[in-house]
């Protein structure tokens, strides 16, 4: 069964790489002023993200198996699996870096692309996941500043709030930004999480009564749902 699974995975990787190479060539042969170019680049970004996720999940699987081998006392197998994990993590990160490079090119050369707010959001989300918190904040704030009607506005305010809360530990600013998430779209998926984090802002600001009231409000809203 493992051999069949490995063969299927190998075939999937080959098909993925072939599709990426074909699209890379198509992008290269498309004129810079062709409206299709940023669309093709966005599609390439999606494919690179899928590639990254595949290898990241494989790396997680290797880690799980390595832990099992370690628990069973098979140190040699554990080290072998951990080496595979490291290799797949590297491939996954390289795919994300390539994706970010593409998105930066779209921003630089195709700033009038109709989906530019989406590109900025994807950039910011991946930057945050990869540890580029400051750059992620710049893109989130860019959405707020330049795309006031964007569907990604709640997520942009949430990304800014998370930076203010976690990195800057600036509770007053974080609280305001979480409040903006809720006011922009109370029904967004980001709003319920923002309401919860508002409770922690109040708690960290030394207002336990407000924090408790906020947490109770979150529970009531969850019960309604």
Locations of regions flagged by a protein language model:
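Acidic, polar-rich low-complexity tracts and alpha-helical solenoid repeat scaffolds
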Residues: 1-225
């Amino acid at each position: 069964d493992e051999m069949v699974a490995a063969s299927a995975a190998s075939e999937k990787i080959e098909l993925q790489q072939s599709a990426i190479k074909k699209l890379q060539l198509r992008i290269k042969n498309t004129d810079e002023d062709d409206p299709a170019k940023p669309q093709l680049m966005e599609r390439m970004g999606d494919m690179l993200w899928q590639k990254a996720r595949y290898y990241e999940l494989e790396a997680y699987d290797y880690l799980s198996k390595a832990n099992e081998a370690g628990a069973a006392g098979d140190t040699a197998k554990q080290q072998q699996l951990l080496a595979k994990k490291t290799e797949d993590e590297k491939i996954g990160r390289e795919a994300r870096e390539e994706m970010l490079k593409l998105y930066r090119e779209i921003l630089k050369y195709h700033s009038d692309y109709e989906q530019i707010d989406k590109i900025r959001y994807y950039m910011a989300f991946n930057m945050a996941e990869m540890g580029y918190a400051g750059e992620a904040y710049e893109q989130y704030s860019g959405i707020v500043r330049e795309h006031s009607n964007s569907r990604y506005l709640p997520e942009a305010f949430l990304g800014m709030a998370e930076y203010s809360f976690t990195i800057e530990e600036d509770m007053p600013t974080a609280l305001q930004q979480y409040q903006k998430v809720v006011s922009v779209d109370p029904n967004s998926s980001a709003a319920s999480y923002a309401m919860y984090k508002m409770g922690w802002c109040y708690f960290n600001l030394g207002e336990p009564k407000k924090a408790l009231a906020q947490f109770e409000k979150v529970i009531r809203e969850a019960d309604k749902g």
